[in-house]
Structure formats: C-alpha cells, structure tokens
C-alpha cells in the first residue's frame, strides 16, 4: 500500500510539472501520442524542460535528488540543457534529531557516548540525504584528545531507498520497451548504476577505506592533505576521521589574505587530479567546492584538504594508457589517432569506420581548439566527445564519465582561483613524463620485473596443460579446445620472445658493466 501511495505521488508531481508531455512524447505508440495530446490540451508550461525536471526531483525527495545528481554526470545520454539544470541539484536536507544520532553512535560502537568522546557536539555541521556530521573529541587510547569529525548514517534509509529503487526499475523497464529512445538511453543500466552507488554510500566502512587509500597515496605529497581514519571508531553506520581546519577553496579572497598563492594553488589542483588518475588509477570523484578546503596553517600553507570520500573512481592500466594517449592526440589535433584509439580500446565497435569517426571527432573538437589554450576545457571536450559517440554506438565506460565530471570540477575550481589557468600547459609535461615511464625502456623493465617470475612459474606446467587439452580434444572431438591450445601456444611464443628480450637486455647490461671495468683496468695499467 505504501508503494502504491508513493507511485501516486510520483504521478501527481509528474503531471504538476508537465513532465508527462516530456516523457510520453518519445513513445512509439500512436495511442500514447493521442493520450499526450488529450492530457496536455489547454496546459501551458513556461519553464524550460530541464528546470521542470529539477523542480520535480526536488519535490520527490532526497533519493530522487541523488538520482538527478548521478544522472547529470551522464552527459553522453542527456541533452545539454537538461544535464546543466540537473547539475544544480543540491543534496541538502534538514538534519535529523541529534539524540537519534547519539543513539546510533552508541549502538554501533557498543559504548555510551561519554566513554567514547570527551565532547560530542550535538549540533551537526553538515547534513545530507545519506548522513550528517558532528564534531567531537576522542576519549581513551593513544588518540585521546584528538579532534574528530563523526559521520552518522541517517536512520531508516534502506527501506526508503529499496522502495524508490523498485519503482525506478519498473519505470525503466517500461521506458526501454515503449520509448523510442529507450534502448539508446539504457534506463535500466542507469538505475542499476544508481542502485550500486546508493548502496555503496550506505556503507560508511567503504567510505573510510576510500579515505585511507587516498591518504596512503598522498602520504609523501606536499600538495594534498587527507584526514586520518580512526578505525576503532568506524562501523557501517559511523565513520570517524581527523577533523581538518581550512578555508573553502571557493573563497579566493580569503585565501589570498591568508598569504596563499592562488595561481600556484590552481596549478596544484590540476597536478593532484592527474596524479590520482595516471599514477594511482584511483581518484576522488566528488571534488566540488564544498568538499575541498585549503590549509592556512603556517606548516601546511596552501595545501589542499580533501573531504567526503563516498564517490571515487578507479581506472585500469589499460584505461590509463589509452586515456593518456587520447589526451596527447587531442592536443596535437591528431583526430585520426583519437578515432583509432577508440576502436583499438574496444570503446567503439570493431565495425566502426575510422574515417567516419575521425570526421565526427574533428567536427566536435575543432571549434574548441581554435581558441587560446588557456580557454580550452578538457572536460567540455570529453563531454562533447561522449555526445558525438552516440551516433557510433560507442560504449561510454562509467569510470570515464566519473572522470569527465571530476575534470569539469577541477577546471572550474582552477579557473576560479586563476582565470588564466592553462590546463594543458600544466597537464602536458605530466602526461608526457607518465607516457615515457610507461612505454619507454623504464616501463618495459618494470613490467618485466613484475611478470617474469609469473611466466617462469607457468612454463614448467605448460607441457602437462597442453597434453590435458589434447586428450580432452580427442575425447570430445570439439574445436574449442584446439582454439584454446592455439591461444596457449601463441602465449608461449609471446612469453618466449619477451623472456628472450629480457635476457638479451640483462646480458647486454652485464656486458656493458664488464666492458667498463675492463677499460678502467686497462687505463690504470
């Protein structure tokens, strides 16, 4: 019954904001089109469609606001005006009762509040749809007296989320079957992505692990501070981390007054982003101004401070390599290389005609590159590329969409601090150095160090595995095993070539050292 009432409310909000016309106009059925005409007869909507959608999501509550925020990152699927409007959604809800927050902390950690903290501020400093944050001072153990931020999960979220997600899945299924653009927009995939995103956010231990990983990655960095995680005070409902002090990155005048070089700060932000993406393959994916502070303490003046680790992105070595090559090809205006990389990486279907994709990419990107480099937005270039990719059935990877959204945030922050920020001038040396390390001799030697022991371990088993496959082939008279054997033989040949190259390299290196010592001995005698 509750679900039925919720559905009725959703339908009412859709009708109130005139979204029925927007939603139903894309359906294939003539009957539905006729229904649209009847329902909208005499109704006039003065607000743009994107604004109406944003207002409807805000009226439906925090879960739908979250959904709109996630949807705003899928610029490969949405019209630009709708995506821009959804990006304005703010995840702000009234705080829940501090007594309930204290009770959750006590139940989750198994101790009274007075045994856990010297002080616990009952007035929350931040409140969102998933959790709210209180400041406190730890009691007991080696961290006694440390100032911390306590993030507490909002109670009763799971039933509400599951109910709304069930409705979203039903609507997505209908859309995919009946809507003309249903298959292209992949509504069920979008809802499934949102489902995973929400359930990840409901586990604060996951967020604590993200914070710990990022802190470890930047432990020796002079650019970024990440709060320490206090694991003994962390559960799936409570996340306790070091309290950080700083000025919001968007308050540029206040930062300058404190002696921070905002031009350097803008460049540092770009370097932090590319370091996360290409060095670590793990990046903070929610870098809006509310989640970034800047330290004004004398010992760490001008260092960024990261907060809120609920959304992170990860890239494989494969993705990092192709992404770096794409960026370099973009700024060399080598559109053929960009198109070729899309096909080679599997992002575009194998049957894609490279020349056609190249022409579409040129038409998409050339208007941007006619501007001065300081005015070029890498994030917007990626966004336009995703939109162009619709025509070629290019499968946009979720991690790349997260990266594009984060890059837009980084650029926006950077140009608030320094309007003349040349993103490419800052990023290019980093990318070229990374590519040299990965693809040059150093990268080859590093990979050989990692892979050679594994290859050496596998080689003795190869004859036995080949014999087993041949026996199975003889029994089953199948062809799949032959293909497997061929693949194994190809792998064996490739392994032999790589090992030979490694031995040749090591041998040459050894000969060089011996020759150097011999020449030195001859020179002395």
Curated annotation (Swiss-Prot):
Q: Which Pfam families match?
A: ABC1
- The reply to whether Amino-acid biosynthesis figures as a keyword in the UniProt entry is no
Disulfide linkage = none
Which residue range or ranges hold the Protein kinase domain?
119-501
Q: What class of enzyme is it?
A: transferase
GO BP term, example: ubiquinone biosynthetic process
Give its localization: Cell inner membrane
This chain's function reads: Is probably a protein kinase regulator of UbiI activity which is involved in aerobic coenzyme Q (ubiquinone) biosynthesis.
* Name of this chain's protein: Probable protein kinase UbiB
What organism is this sequence from? Ralstonia nicotianae (strain ATCC BAA-1114 / GMI1000)
Quick one: which gene encodes this?
A: ubiB
């Amino acid at each position: 019954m509750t679900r039925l009432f919720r559905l009725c409310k959703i339908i009412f909000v859709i009708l109130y904001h005139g979204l029925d016309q927007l939603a139903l106009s894309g359906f294939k059925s003539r009957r539905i089109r006729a229904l649209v005409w009847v329902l909208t007869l005499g109704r006039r909507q003065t607000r743009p469609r994107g604004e109406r959608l944003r207002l409807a999501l805000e009226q439906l509550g925090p879960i739908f606001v979250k959904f709109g925020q996630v949807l705003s990152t899928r610029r490969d699927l949405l019209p630009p005006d709708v995506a821009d409007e959804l990006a304005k959604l703010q995840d702000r809800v009234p705080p829940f009762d501090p007594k309930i927050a204290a009770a959750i902390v006590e139940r989750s950690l198994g101790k009274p509040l007075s045994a856990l903290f010297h002080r616990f501020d009952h007035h929350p400093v931040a409140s969102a749809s998933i959790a709210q944050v209180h400041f406190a001072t730890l009691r007991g153990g080696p961290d006694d007296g440390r100032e911390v931020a306590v993030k507490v999960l909002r109670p009763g979220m799971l039933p509400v989320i599951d109910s709304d997600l069930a409705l979203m899945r039903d609507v997505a299924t209908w859309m995919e079957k009946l809507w003309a653009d249903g298959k292209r927009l992949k509504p069920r995939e979008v809802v499934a992505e949102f489902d995973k995103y929400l359930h990840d956010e409901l586990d604060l231990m996951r967020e604590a692990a993200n914070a710990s990983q990022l802190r470890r990655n930047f432990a020796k960095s002079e650019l970024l501070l990440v709060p320490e995680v206090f694991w003994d005070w962390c559960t799936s409902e409570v996340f306790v981390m070091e309290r950080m002090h700083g000025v919001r990155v968007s308050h540029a005048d206040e930062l300058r007054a404190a002696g921070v070089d905002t031009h350097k700060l803008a460049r540092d932000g770009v370097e932090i982003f590319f370091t996360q993406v290409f060095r670590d393959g793990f990046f903070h994916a929610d870098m809006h101004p509310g989640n970034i502070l800047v330290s004004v303490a004398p010992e760490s003046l001008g260092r960024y401070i990261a907060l809120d680790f609920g959304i992170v992105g990860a890239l494989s070595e494969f993705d990092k390599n192709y992404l770096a090559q794409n960026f370099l090809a973009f700024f060399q205006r080598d559109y053929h290389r960009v198109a070729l990389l899309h096909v080679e990486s599997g992002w575009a279907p194998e049957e894609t005609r490279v020349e056609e994709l190249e022409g579409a990419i040129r038409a998409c990107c050339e208007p941007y590159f006619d501007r001065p480099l300081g005015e070029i937005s890498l994030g917007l270039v990626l966004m336009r590329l995703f939109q162009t990719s619709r025509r070629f059935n290019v499968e946009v990877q979720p991690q790349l969409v997260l990266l594009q959204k984060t890059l837009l945030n980084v650029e926006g922050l950077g140009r608030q601090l320094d309007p003349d920020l040349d993103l490419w001038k800052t990023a290019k040396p980093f990318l070229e150095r990374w590519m040299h390390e990965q693809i040059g001799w150093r990268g080859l030697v590093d990979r050989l160090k990692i892979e050679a022991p594994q290859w050496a371990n596998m080689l003795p088993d190869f004859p036995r595995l080949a014999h087993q496959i041949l026996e199975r082939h003889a029994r089953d008279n199948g062809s799949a095993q032959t293909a497997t054997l061929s693949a194994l033989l190809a792998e064996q040949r490739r392994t032999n070539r790589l090992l030979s190259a490694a031995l040749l390299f090591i041998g040459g290196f050894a000969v060089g050292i011996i020759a150097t010592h011999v020449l030195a001995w001859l020179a002395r005698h």
